[in-house]
Every structure is written in structure tokens, then in C-alpha cells.
Regions:
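Alpha/beta-hydrolase fold nucleophile elbow
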Residues: 1-7
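Catalytic nucleophile serine of serine hydrolases
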Residues: 7-8, 32
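Flexible "cap/lid" loop of the alpha/beta hydrolase fold
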Residues: 14-62
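Conserved alpha/beta-hydrolase catalytic His-Asp/Glu region
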Residues: 39, 43-47, 58-118
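Short alpha-helix in the alpha/beta-hydrolase fold that links the catalytic acid
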Residues: 106, 113, 122, 137-145
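Short beta-strand/loop motif that positions the catalytic acidic residue
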Residues: 120, 126-128, 132
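Acidic catalytic loop of the alpha/beta-hydrolase fold
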Residues: 130-135, 162
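Catalytic active-site module of serine/aspartate enzymes centered on a nucleophile-bearing elbow/loop
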Residues: 149-187
């Protein structure tokens, strides 16, 4: 089985592996992870200041559709996307209850996944856009790769956080190739 997560879902993947082991899991794929830790703290001085995170939450709370419109371009990076794709992703966010959005953001920005990442023992592919404004690659993707022994980091130039939607034409083949490579090695 291959576990695939995007954004906060990457935290779910690594937390699952750290708690339940990898007996049934052959590999993992982490897309634009928010791991290992976003918020600034005493032992994470390069993180995002909590005041900035609070301001982002306040902006979201004040006007969800406006927040989506303001953040659409950074979400997709330099990848050209159709207005329909922007509308589809925006609709998913707008249709999510506000309390769920806020609590999810608070959880994924303050949860420390460093120990979880260090315990991952399955082959892991990390794909991250170099223009990811939601989870900057130097704060998240590169550090995640450094904490998982033997992981592979694939950087998409010009891609943002929404690479699953904007860059699916290159993402899907890369994920399938990784799964195929790992299956061939296991055979």
C-alpha cells in the first residue's frame, strides 16, 4: 500500500506511520508537506511568527471568499491555471465550515512532527513547489526530506502549494514512477 498526503495530510501520513508502524505500508508520497513544524518556537527559530499566523486566521475568518481570491495566485504558483480550476478549489474551501478551516490551520501550523518524521522507515517521495507560499519549501519540504532517512525530494520549479491541481500532468506520472520503481526493487 502507498500512503499519499497533501499539505496537512502529510502530517496524517507520518503520524500514522509513527503510531501504527509500516507493516502494511510499502511507501509514502508527501505532496507540499506542512511538516515538520511551521510555527516559530524556542527550538524552531526559523518558523513563522505566531502573530503572522494569527493575522492569517483573522483574514480568513473575516472573508473566506476574499481570502481565497487574494491567495489563489500564490496557491498555484507560476503555473497557468484556468478560472474554472481556481473556482473549483475556492468552492471546496468556501464549502468547508469556518470552524473546521480555523482549527485545521491551527493544528497543522503548531503540531511538531519532527519525531514522527524521524521514525519513518518506508521509501518516501516528497514533491514540493519552489514557489509554495503556504508551506515554504525551505521551512517544510527540505526539512521534511532531511528528517526522513533515504527520502527523495523532487522540487517543481514554479509550482505552488496547489500542485495536486495545477501540476497534475507531471505530478501523476512522477508518483506512478516512484510506485513502479519501489515495486521493481521489492520484486
Amino acid at each position: 500500500m502507498t500512503l499519499v498526503g497533501h499539505s496537512a495530510g502529510c502530517g496524517e501520513v507520518v503520524r500514522y506511520l509513527s503510531r501504527h508502524g509500516d507493516d502494511r505500508v510499502e511507501r509514502a508520497v508527501l505532496l507540499a508537506p506542512v511538516t515538520p513544524l511551521i510555527a516559530k518556537s524556542g527550538d524552531n527559530p526559523g518558523g513563522v511568527d505566531p502573530a503572522i499566523l494569527a493575522a492569517g486566521a483573522a483574514s480568513l475568518m473575516a472573508d473566506v471568499p476574499g481570502w481565497c481570491a487574494e491567495n489563489a495566485r500564490p496557491f498555484f504558483g507560476a503555473t497557468a491555471v484556468s478560472p474554472g480550476l481556481v473556482e473549483w478549489v475556492t468552492r471546496q474551501i468556501v464549502d468547508t465550515p469556518l470552524q473546521s478551516l480555523l482549527e485545521t490551520a491551527a493544528a497543522y501550523t503548531t503540531t511538531d512532527f519532527r519525531a514522527d518524521l524521524a521514525s519513518v522507515r518506508v521509501p518516501t517521495l516528497i514533491i514540493h513547489g519552489d514557489l509554495d507560499a503556504s508551506a515554504p519549501i525551505d521551512l517544510t519540504g527540505r526539512r521534511t526530506a532531511a528528517l526522513i532517512t533515504g527520502s527523495r525530494l523532487l522540487v517543481y520549479e514554479g509550482s505552488g502549494h496547489g500542485l495536486y491541481a495545477a501540476d497534475h500532468a507531471r505530478l501523476n506520472p512522477d508518483v506512478l514512477a516512484f510506485i513502479g520503481e519501489e515495486r521493481a526493487l521489492a520484486a
